[in-house]
Amino acid sequence: MRTLEDSSGTVLHRLIQEQLRYGNLTETRTLLAIQQQALRGGAGAGGTGSPQASLEIGAPEDSQVLQQATRQEPQGQEHQGGETHLAENRLYRLCPQPSKGEELPTYEEAKAHSQYYAAQQAGSRPHVGDRDPRGGVSGGGRRQDEALRELRHGHVRSLSERLLQLSLERNGARVPSHMSSSHSFPQLARSQQGPQPRGPPAEGPEPRGPPPQYPHAVMAQETAAVTDPRYRPRSSPHFQHAEVRILQAQVPPVFLQQQQYQYLPQPQEHSPPLHPAALGHGPPSSFGPPAVEGPPSAQATLGSAHLAQMETVLRENARLQRDNERLQRELESTSEKAGRIEKLENEIQRLSEAHESLMRTSSKREALEKTMRNKMDGEMRRLQDFNRDLRERLESANRHLASKTQEAQAGSQDMVAKLLAQSYEQQQEQEKLEREMALLRGAIEDQRRHAELLEQALGNAQSRAARAEEELRKKQAYVEKVERLQQALGQLQAACEKREQLELRLRTRLEQELKALRAQQRQTGTLAGGGGSHGGSAELSALRLSEQLREKEEQILALEADMTKWEQKYLEERAMRQFAMDAAATAAAQRDTTLIRHSPQPSPSSSFNEGLLPGNHRHQEMESRLKVLHAQILEKDAVIKVLQQRSRKDPGKATQGTLRPAKSVPSIFAAAVGTQGWQGLVSSERQTDARPAGDRVPAEEPPATAPLPAHTKHGSRDGSTQTDGPADNTSACLASEPDGLLGCNSSQRTPSLDSIAATRVQDLSDMVEILI
């Protein structure tokens, strides 16, 4: 099916291309109209999916095809007819599918077939009601019948040859010159020499020439067609031109008749289409145009006669179509019956073969059963003989066993008498052993109680020894603590005494300096008194300021004395608090030891408890040691806090001592130094409070923001003695002349401060080492 469609579409496509390239405009338009009719029919059948959809296009649509066709290049749409449209066409269903080894039709046959196919399609559109609804039967059953396929093949081949012969007979006398001389129409030349047979042609290869070469000008054809007396004018305006009359010689007569029916106003529009068989068997004179041109009345009579003839032909065609469809239905029914019969025969053959195989298996089974029955009979006889022998053996064994039992009963009575005598003796011995065991058990219980008492005494002694050791350790620790605290207290007292002595010396030195300054101020006042009345007010203001300065200095000295007194009280309270903390720590350790001592001790009777005793003892020792270490850590923390507090307060005293190092401007310098000292003291207190409670760092360096003192106490490496190092520098500066006091303070202050800081850090580290 696909091969025939491709071949017909390819031939029509080549013909249109060559006509567009070499032919005239009228022939090109006609071929394009044929192609568009074929494409429109294929598109209608492929779009709706039913044969009736392709037949609903009316005759006026076919009459406008020649006017709408224009010259265009081939767009590749010639193959879009679809297999559905070809399967719906009756002529294609009658046409067989060529096999791979079959020869394709020739160029002229394909051309005539395509023209007739387009004309048949255009003519079969109005006749919708004449189609049988069973015409769309699937072609699967028809393709299975090879005889029917060969018959249709021959019928279609004879039909195409008949159409070609009719066209040659009609057009042979008109254009004999150019048709016979064309190399592309070899069959036309052969048809002029002799008529072609009705039967199918041979299957051998046919000679084919090159593609047709159409002339560029058809003037000779036009003149020949005009002078030909057989051409007569038609009633339709499309047949008034010479090009159309020339094209009539190349188009099959059926196509011309269909075109003529479109312009005749007859009520036979819906008559059935012309059957190819009727066309093939009709007289040739009925398909040609009228030979003589006459008046309109003669043309009307000719048209009516022609219409009557066509009606008879169409009725015959419809009858043949009905007969053909009936025969097709009968053939399909007979083929179905034959298929059923063949299936029944196959089933019967299969059943017979199964029956034969079943008979063979049943015979084999019977023979096998017979052999097995014989074997079973022999086996049963053998087993019966064996059973008889076993029964005889059993009877002889029973007789032998009865004789043996009688002998055994006589011997067993003697043995029972002997065993009774032996059992009586053994019972007496057992009672004696039980009495001895009871005595031994009582002795063992007494020994066990004695051992428990000894173990309890040993445990009590060990616990008392451990308690004594713990108390001894605690007392030793208390003694060491007391010794350390006494040493620290002696050092604190010595430091306090030295500090009081230093304060006394500083106070006396400051009083002397104050007296010297007052004397100097009086001298300057007397010298400046003779200067005039203007200096009187300045002298009064200076005297007033000096009095205020003296009062402030006295207040500062009183505050310093109060501060030293409160510091001493604070240190004493701190020491008392430390003693209270140590007492609390020792009380907690003692409470833990008493809890451990009064805890229930396991009995050492079992070996497992004896193995656990050393482990428990070691565990208790470790706990007591950890508690002692914890108490020592608390003591050291308290000492470190005391030292930190001292280091925090010593810079304050140093700043108080350096409140008046200068003599020229004492009030301003004292205010600045006092502010810096208090800021340093506050920052050092914040840093100390921010440290965690469990901090075990032995000493802290003084904060960088705190001002370093101009005089402080520093001692030797053992911390026993303390001297005043930088104070000598200060006294030297104070003993010098008043004019050089400021220079002494500014030049000697920096190295003295550095040395004081170094000695203070060394003092603190030595003190911490001694206390720890």
From Swiss-Prot:
GO MF assignments: actin filament binding; identical protein binding; protein-containing complex binding
Source taxon at top rank: Eukaryota
Name of one Pfam family that matches: Angiomotin_C
UniProt GO BP: endothelial cell morphogenesis; negative regulation of transcription by RNA polymerase II; positive regulation of protein localization; Wnt signaling pathway
Biased composition range(s): Pro residues: 197-214
Motif PDZ-binding per record, residues: 769-772
Site feature (Required for interaction with MAGI1 and ACTB) residues: Y107
Family affiliation: Belongs to the angiomotin family.
Protein name: Angiomotin-like protein 2
